[in-house]
């Protein structure tokens, strides 16, 4: 009695005691195989946890361990990761049923259930359903099911079990306080994610939700975003490597004001792109001051989107990590972002642009390659009006190479493209038409188009034409006639000719209704082609620079009426079928900025 001490008792009570066979790499098939585990359970008075991670458990062995667990009502942590390697699909649910039934008999009160890295699937979930609905889980705080291959069906089964658990716990007077759900790499897809969202919205108690790499698209993202609004205590939210796109980012951004305690948000590799960055930036600028970690890496965000995000960090005094690596900033854009971040007291939070360094090395290689290509191209230009066989052969060789490279994925417009129609470009176009047309259109480059304008002359002129020239296009279907010229070219030639034919019509848009209608149709055709060839960012930036809405690294003079071209673009944006929301919103943002 003299050694009786409340403090020591409290300390002892606070110390977890348990049994671990972690990473023993043992194969347990029979009761005899697990005798050491059973003996430990029988001998140890207090067992708060049992760690079986890294072994493989059969049905009979699970039944024997279950007999030992029945003796421990104080049991609270089932650390059962990676324990069914090499097992038959029929063994897993049976083994889980034995373990779960034992905990129910013992009257255990689980706080942690970790079954990560087990190939459960819907079949394995059948072995968990009874346990998850039982009083054993009324006290559950952490449910860890990473890399369990649940699929949509397994996700649906889990959701229903959690909703039933919530109802059962409330009815028994023990409200469920599940705080953590780790469900990455489960192939939930939209159907499974939507079902899980129903559970999240029902429970309303989550502080951490991790759903990395689950093949979730916009339908699932919308449902999840709505469910997050009902979990105001969320501190960690991780949906890396799902396909949010800008639409999904908008939905998540709408949920952020409902999450004032958020400390970590991770949406890397989610294809949110620049428009998605705008959505996040706008929301973050207004709140979420407690954020410490933000991961938006590898999202194809351009430097404008990166700057918007950095500007939203001004009210984040606790920021420790801001990961924007792997986006499409370019060297100059990266420098601007680093410069803007350096003005903040949390400047050290910005992670290095390691991926950008790799891209810079590739850019240097490509630049060297382009220099070599340019030298070869100059030889062609020297023979632009030469009709000799030698000149024709050289020209054809270069054109073949150009076509091969024309549709390659484009990465950094601001640094790698000249934003003007150069003589080299027009020479190339004219070499693809007849020699007589080529010489005629060269003459057009420095004077007004001839009295009667043809579709060829209209499209291939280096300068915009007059209203008189436009009116002299006397064919019934001007759009079809112009497109027939554009469609004779491929790759970048097709793209650039389409852009500048559009601008030629837009140039006259406020003086001619017919020109305006053509410009609207051609703007749409331009971005339909950009989407089809996966060049949205490239073409968007190119047109923005031609309209003086985006700074251009290379100074150039334009003969086009920018005001008229912008007017036609605004009319095109009103069309419900124009491009997509990302392109529409980007144009609207820049146009509004130009007006302010």
Curated annotation (Swiss-Prot):
Organism listed in the record: Drosophila melanogaster
SUPFAM superfamilies: Ran-GTPase activating protein 1 (RanGAP1), C-terminal domain, RNI-like
A GO CC term attached to the entry: cytosol
Cellular compartment(s): Cytoplasm; Nucleus membrane
Pfam families listed in its UniProt record: LRR_6
Keywords: Cytoplasm, GTPase activation, Leucine-rich repeat, Membrane, Nucleus, Phosphoprotein, Repeat
GO biological process, one term: regulation of nucleocytoplasmic transport
Protein's recorded name: Ran GTPase-activating protein
Membrane-crossing residue ranges in chain numbering: none
GO molecular function: GTPase activator activity; RNA binding; small GTPase binding
């Amino acid at each position: 009695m003299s050694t009786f001490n409340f403090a020591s008792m409290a300390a002892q009570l606070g110390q977890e005691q348990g049994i671990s066979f972690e990473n023993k790499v043992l194969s347990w098939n029979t009761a005899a195989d697990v005798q050491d585990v059973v003996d430990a359970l029988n001998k140890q008075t207090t067992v708060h946890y049992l760690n079986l991670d890294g072994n493989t458990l059969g049905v009979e062995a699970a039944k024997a361990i279950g007999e030992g667990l029945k003796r421990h009502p104080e049991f609270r942590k089932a650390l059962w990761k990676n324990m069914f390697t090499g097992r038959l699909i029929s063994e897993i649910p049976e083994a889980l049923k034995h373990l779960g039934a034992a905990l129910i008999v013992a009257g255990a009160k689980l706080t942690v259930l970790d079954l990560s890295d087990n190939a459960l699937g819907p079949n394995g979930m059948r072995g968990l359903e009874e346990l998850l609905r039982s009083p054993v889980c009324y006290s559950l705080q952490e449910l860890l099911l990473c890399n369990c291959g649940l699929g949509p069906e397994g996700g649906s089964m889990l959701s229903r079990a959690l909703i039933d658990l919530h109802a059962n716990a409330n009815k028994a007077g023990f409200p469920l306080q599940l705080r953590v759900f780790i469900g990455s790499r489960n192939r939930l897809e939209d159907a499974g994610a939507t079902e899980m969202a129903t559970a999240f919205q029902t429970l309303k108690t989550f502080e951490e939700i991790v759903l990395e790499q689950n093949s979730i698209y916009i339908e699932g993202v919308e449902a999840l975003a709505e469910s997050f609004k009902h979990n105001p205590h969320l501190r960690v939210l991780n949906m890396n490597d799902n396909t949010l796109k800008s639409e999904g980012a908008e939905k998540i951004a709408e949920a952020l004001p409902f999450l004032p305690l958020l400390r970590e948000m991770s949406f890397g590799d989610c294809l949110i792109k620049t428009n998605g960055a705008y959505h996040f930036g706008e929301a973050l600028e207004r709140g979420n001051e407690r954020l410490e970690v933000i991961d938006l890496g590898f999202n194809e965000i351009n430097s404008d989107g990166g700057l918007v995000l950095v500007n939203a960090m001004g009210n984040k005094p606790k920021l420790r990590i801001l990961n924007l690596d792997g986006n499409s900033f370019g060297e100059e854009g990266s420098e601007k972002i680093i410069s803007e971040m350096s003005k903040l007291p949390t400047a050290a939070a910005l992670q290095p642009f390691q991926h950008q360094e790799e891209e810079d090395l590739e850019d240097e290689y490509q630049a060297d390659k382009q220099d070599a290509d340019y030298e070869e191209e100059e030889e062609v230009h020297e023979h632009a009006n030469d009709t000799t066989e030698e000149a024709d052969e050289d020209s054809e060789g270069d054109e073949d190479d150009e076509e091969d490279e024309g549709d390659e994925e484009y990465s950094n417009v601001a640094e790698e493209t000249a934003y003007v129609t150069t003589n080299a470009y027009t020479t190339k176009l004219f070499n693809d038409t007849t020699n007589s047309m080529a010489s005629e259109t060269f003459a057009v480059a420095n004077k007004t188009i001839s009295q009667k304008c043809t579709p060829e002359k209209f499209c291939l002129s280096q300068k915009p034409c007059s209203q008189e020239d436009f009116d002299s296009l006397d064919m019934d279907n001007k759009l079809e006639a112009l497109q027939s010229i554009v469609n004779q070219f491929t790759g970048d030639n097709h793209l650039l000719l389409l852009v500048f034919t559009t601008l030629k019509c837009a140039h006259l848009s406020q003086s001619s209704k017919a020109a305006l209608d053509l410009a609207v149709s051609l703007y749409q055709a331009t971005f339909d082609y950009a989407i089809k060839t996966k060049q949205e960012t490239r073409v968007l930036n190119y047109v923005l620079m031609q309209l003086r809405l985006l700074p251009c690294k290379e100074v150039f003079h334009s003969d086009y009426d920018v005001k008229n071209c912008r007017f036609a673009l605004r009319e095109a944006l009103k069309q419900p079928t124009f491009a997509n929301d990302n392109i529409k919103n980007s144009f609207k943002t820049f146009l509004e900025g130009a007006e302010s």
